[in-house]
Amino acid sequence: MSKVLILKSSILGDYSQSGQLVEHLKQHWEQQGAEISVRDLAAEPLPMLDGEIASGLRGGDQLSARQEQALLLSDSLIQELKAHDTIVIAAPMYNFSIPTQLKNWIDLVARAGVSFTYTETGPKGLITGKRAVLITTRGGVHKGGASDHVVPYLKTVLGFIGIEEVETVYSEALNMGPEASKQGIESAQQALEKIVA
């Protein structure tokens, strides 16, 4: 049975377009018997990386209570990642980048010696044998252009920790009028259905 981890990062709650697409994908996977876990990074935000937490994530025997909590949380998030076959990341474009809530997750998951390591030939990801599906929503049209920092960044991060099989579903032009928005959602839904098929 396939195990799927869904990461939601929109701050818009029930009004989230990326959330609607995630739900569409989730329903299709559930019909196939997939085991699905959902982590809503906006509804249950993770701590933002600062100097104290960054130092604590390196470990040690003289950690503050806050550092110990962050280290345990990071370990838990990485184990959660390892326990699933497919990782779905819903990443709306906010000001040409990803939501802060998703960046917080990345900062807790990307850990030297745990999710990646440095070798003589360069960095090597340690979370392998997974695939990722990126669902990215945006008000305008940015796919493949210089203004799209979302997909290249996420692919780089995922590859860095070992997840190199990445499929991307774009839902664009969502703020460019009702017809364009409808088409942007429907084309993304069709692309998601092909992934599940």
From Swiss-Prot:
It is an enzyme of class 1 (oxidoreductase). The keyword Flavoprotein applies. Keywords: Flavoprotein, FMN, NAD, Oxidoreductase. GO terms for molecular function: electron transfer activity; FMN binding; oxidoreductase activity, acting on NAD(P)H as acceptor; oxidoreductase activity, acting on NAD(P)H, quinone or similar compound as acceptor. Transmembrane segments: none annotated. It holds the Pfam family Flavodoxin_2. It catalyses: 2 a quinone + NADH + H(+) = 2 a 1,4-benzosemiquinone + NAD(+); N,N-dimethyl-1,4-phenylenediamine + anthranilate + 2 NAD(+) = 2-(4-dimethylaminophenyl)diazenylbenzoate + 2 NADH + 2 H(+). Binds 1 FMN per subunit. Its EC number is 1.6.5.-, 1.7.1.17. FMN binds at S10, S16, Q17, S18, M93, Y94, N95, F96, T137, R138, G139, G140. Its cofactor is FMN. Belongs to the azoreductase type 1 family. Quinone reductase that provides resistance to thiol-specific stress caused by electrophilic quinones. Homodimer. This is FMN-dependent NADH:quinone oxidoreductase. The lineage of its organism: Bacteria, Pseudomonadati, Pseudomonadota, Gammaproteobacteria, Alteromonadales.
